[in-house]
Amino acid sequence: MRFLLFFLVFNISNFISAQISNNDENIYDSLFVKWNDTFLTPKNTALNLVCPKIDTVRIAVIGLGNRGMMAIERLPQIPTIKIVAIADIDSNKVNKALRSLHDTQFDLPKPYYEKNDWKLICQRNDIDLIYVCTHWELHTPIAIYAMEHDKHVAVEVPAALTVDECWQLVKTAEKTRKHCIQLENCMYDFFELTALNMVQNNLLGEVVHVEGAYIHDLRSLNFSNTYYWNNWRLKRLQQTNGNTYPTHGLGPLAHLLNIHRGDKMSHLVSMSSDQFGLTKYANDQLKDSDNWKGNKFEKGDMNTTLIKTANGKTIMLQHDVTSPRPYSRLFTVSGTDGFIQKYPKPTIALEPKAHFSFSSKQIDSIMTVYEPKTIKEIKEKALKVGGHGGMDFIMDYRLIYCLNNGLPLDQDVYDAAEWSSIIELSKKSVRSGSKTVKIPDFTRNNWNVLNKVSYYLK
């Protein structure tokens, strides 16, 4: 590996040409592995959970807001699914979804319009997967009810809002032996997937520190009276502090660090700035008659959370949806032999010349070599179908592929619980003056049963 690093730095053009000419096999694809029964885990856990194959996955989409409508447009591009039910309390959105599906699916799904119709959907016996895209407060209740009625669940982020809800998800998934995952699309960003494969090939040596974020100026959308139903997202900023949306930044880093697959998050400290931006925006942009003008918001503009793992690694997470600045998830990875960062621009630096980043052309070449073969095979379609640059389609594709073939899913219920728990735990630390807060081990001492993150193939 040291020779490879040296060769990459000083003779990268020849290195890339040699690897690209080897079309038979991507010898650097460590992330996607063929499943076999030696990967089975104890029956009392949901680690590497295996369920019967489903040839055609019958899906109910609950919640047809922004994410739900995008799913309605993407999912029919996968031939082994059928949407059999859709639900939203806004009849206009239901009818819009039906019109969209009329062009992509022969049999239209049964529409549901009432507030509690999600329970009727979960009670049906002709549904395999409940795809939850509602506002956050309904994520856990629907997921629990669905699993209790023999359904797999894919729930938008965050999967839960409290540690207690996280435990409910874990215990229900273990008891019912049903998949329960978050629809964390950032796991499938081309750069982040390739970086994960690079780390698994030891290109950076031992990873020591990582940084992630959700930095996204949402002021105009949050104060819109139409974009988020009933201003549910703005109300969260009014009512709570800490990191209220951690999973986009944390998810890819957690897999990169093999969290609950050889390491675990141990404890955190969290600190928030005071709140300035929302008040200023409301005063500057809203009409005097707007009900939100003059409101107080608990959420500080910038939250920074530091996490320590059992193996001595550190994670920095940031959350800011109120500042006028470019979008960023940071995605910074620092190891003993090199460095990767996506934002503000892709950067790769490796020993022995790590003081300098490779050029953009060289970075593209490195990414070409280490992009997993499985992703290369579906990349063209993913880019065509779209969804945040294609990562949403890859997320759906991998979910359905694993259900079709009876494989463990790329994410599991412990991921959902660990990443979502940061919401309440960071809030607790902020309120205590940034005292240390312990992070629960949702696997209950099974965090080192597996030794790495793997995405499985048949």
Feature locations, PLM:
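Bacterial Sec-dependent N-terminal signal peptides
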Residues: 1-21
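N-terminal glycine-/serine-/threonine-rich beta1-alpha1-beta2 phosphate-ribose binding loop
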Residues: 19-149, 167, 171-179
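C-terminal helical cap and adjacent loop that interface with cofactors, partners, or active-site loops
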Residues: 20-42, 47, 70, 324-458
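ADP-ribose/adenylate-binding Rossmann-like module
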Residues: 150-162
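Predominantly a Rossmann-like dinucleotide-binding segment in NAD(P)-dependent oxidoreductases
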Residues: 176-181, 186-297
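Active-site beta-strand termini and strand-to-loop segments that position acidic
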Residues: 305-311, 335
